[in-house]
Amino acid sequence: MTDESWPMVEEAVFRLFDELAAKDAGEHVAVGPRLAELGWSDIEAEYPIEACQLLFRAQGRSLAHTDCLDRVMVAELAALLDEPVDGIVLPDLVAGYTPGSDSDRVAGIVLGPLDGRLVVPVSGAMGAVSVGVIEADRLTGQRLDTFDPSAYWTQVSGPLDVALVDASTEWNRAIAAAHRALATELVALADQTLRIAVDHVKVRVQFGAPIGSFQSPRHALADASAVLEGARALLGESWRYGGRLSAQTAKAAAGRAHRAVADAALQVSGAIGLTAEHELHRYVTRGFQVDSLCGSYLQLEALLGERLFDIYAPGRPLPAIVTRAED
């Protein structure tokens, strides 16, 4: 594959996710078989970062519900797993990115219906994490009443009596991968939200002129766009250099940027933007829903602040968000 062929890959993936969103609206889709038809393993091998980014750009753009997040996190834990799994039990929303399960009991969230074999991360002493695998039919699940009504999330609980293996390092990598992936989806959702608002102010006429010609709407959208571009730049650095802290910061920035764009878009769109018939609310509610996974931007900002205060001392520099490898 050449760099010239990458736009064709993007087009194919965008088209696939648009089809999934249209055909399987409201359903949680295992996207692996459809990606295999595109030769995804070869694409991932040649463009590992760009391929992962593309999936979450496409998901945010299309509003499809897929198992992409499970795929990304399980890939970081794969070396510890003896057999293939179908998903992962994510931490409860109030727990941020700390697993809610312990050595005796499963507690957390599954994206989609409760089915198949699931990886269960388990919190231990001093921040340690271990993982086990359990059959979904041994757990109890209840569909959550989500802010985005199209999202299918399941609250799961049940006894845990399977073998556990230490996975502290692998779990940190999985959470960092999740933060980058979710941040990418949030930026894509914010892009679509901003596009809708800009299109609206171009055609909505008040006082004999498009409202986009007035200073207040222009400045509100420009300010939101600036916040979004800052988050996009930080996210790009996190993808480029990796690291847990940079991923956490990128997701916090992306969540805050989506909120800023949503606030501005709802303001300039007026009452029409709140109606079920208008598409704006779909990108707003989906963004709020996605932001809550693995730590909302408010939770992550609080954790980042606590870390800075814990390590601060007079004369000591702040920690680097991005650390470049030495040449």
Language-model features, listed with the residues they occupy:
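Active-site nucleophile and cofactor-binding loops and adjacent substrate-binding regions
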Residues: 45-48, 66-73
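Alpha-helical interface subdomain recognition
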Residues: 1-62, 176-327
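Generic short alpha-helical segment signal, independent of protein family or function
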Residues: 56-64, 78-83
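Generic structural signal for helix capping and beta-alpha/helix-loop junctions
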Residues: 73-76, 275
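FAD-binding core of flavoproteins
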Residues: 69, 76-195, 315-327
